[in-house]
Amino acid sequence: MGRKKIQITRIMDERNRQVTFTKRKFGLMKKAYELSVLCDCEIALIIFNSSNKLFQYASTDMDKVLLKYTEYNEPHESRTNSDIVETLRKKGLNGCESPDADDYFEHSPLSEDRFSKLNEDSDFIFKRGPPGLPAQNFSMSVTVPVSNPNTLTYSNPGSSLVSPSLAASSSLTSTTMLSPPQTTLHRNVSPGAPQRPPSTGNAGGILGTTDLTVPNGAGTSPVGNGVWNSRASPSLLGTAGGGNGLGKVMPTKSPPPPGGGGLGMNNRKPDLRVVIPPSSKGMMPPLTEEDELELNTQRISSSQSTQPLATPVVSVTTPSFPPAGLVYSAMPTAYNTDYSLTSADLSAFEGFNSPGMLSLGQVSPWQQHHLGPATLSSLVSGSQLSQGSNLSINTNQNINIKSEPISPPRDRVNSSGFPQQQPPQQPQPPQPPQQPPQRQEMGRSPVDSLSSSSSSYDGSDREDPRSDFHSPVVLGRPPNSEDRESPSVKRMRMDTWVT
């Protein structure tokens, strides 16, 4: 196969002409080099291109060759283009085709440099492999998918406190009140446990070794340095339950944190299970007296540990969460007037209901109107709570609740017009000797009418028709509060509200 032959005529295209000049010039110099070496001769090549640029080649020194050229009188052979064409014509080439087939494919030094560079680049690419492959080992921040765009990545301020099966958190960055649930926040709960739509609070405070979650959060926002912001939004503490108001407490699937975690889990009761059969919302039968006494015994026995709390409960208005290893039962806090319980707040907790738990569904609208000022800014703290403590609220969404100060004066006038006096301080009922003194330090607030005292109090109080108000979680005032009341005083005050 021969190479392509071109016609020897002037190239009209400027670019093609420049390329051809570069290639053939180098070819000419290459031929001169070969001739000078092979035949031991001196060669001087002088070229002016169409732009009058000088290109020269000399086998040794150009001046020496030119000096020798001027000394000669008569050249031995002198040729021009016409002579070359005539010679070619005689040889049968007719001057129409290139006599040297290799000249067209000769390369200039510049073009060869380009080609060599391209070859090196291609070799480097082929050896390295295709670029852009992602690294196999990479880290990814985990976020909880919620409908609220204000989400935070999960942070673990106390790694020994959080159960791995519940490592999820979301945050409401604004300090507004709670809104009704929009979507379901899926959490890693025990198999078989239904999930409920949470409010838009954050789920800070997942601090138990059982599958206990805080779906609404406790108004806290986990921060990586161990300090927990408590101003996100108020909400209640409870376990993950279904939309029909059911809650299940399943035993933990992860090993308990080490004993140095400071939560007093050494003497917890591992076999405590509260499994509630499914039923429709609002149709939960009350617990029997034997069940309540058994739960009381279990809670009392589970509270006999080196620390006052078996499952720490989160304070809504605590300015900052103490580091891991401290006691969470009697944290000092102050009443905060920023939050009040509105109808939107109560509707956010719809779907929380369980026997022996707090329920607003059976309270008259007038009573709910008076329960509204008792805001969630009081301390959500239980005394010696068991691992399966639950708190649920079920209410109507169309009730208008007036927003009032969190810490009302001692002499108040309710909407009926008669003064409502704070009952005098009364001593606490007799308590079992196994309870630590942390129980006696807990005060009472008007929100206690929403939930009964901790189940370790006198069980006879559960005989009244409002036995469904008994909740293991206590909404209590901080320990520095002065007015401390017994369950009987709360019942009397609830009775005075009914007209």
From Swiss-Prot:
One of its GO terms (molecular function) is protein dimerization activity. GO terms for biological process: apoptotic process; cell differentiation; heart development; nervous system development; positive regulation of transcription by RNA polymerase II. It comes from the Eukaryota. SMART domains: MADS. Residues 288-295 are annotated as: Beta domain. Residues 3-57 form the MADS-box domain. Residues 173-269, 380-499 are annotated as: Disordered. This is Myocyte-specific enhancer factor 2A. The lineage of its organism: Eukaryota, Metazoa, Chordata, Craniata, Vertebrata. The gene is MEF2A.
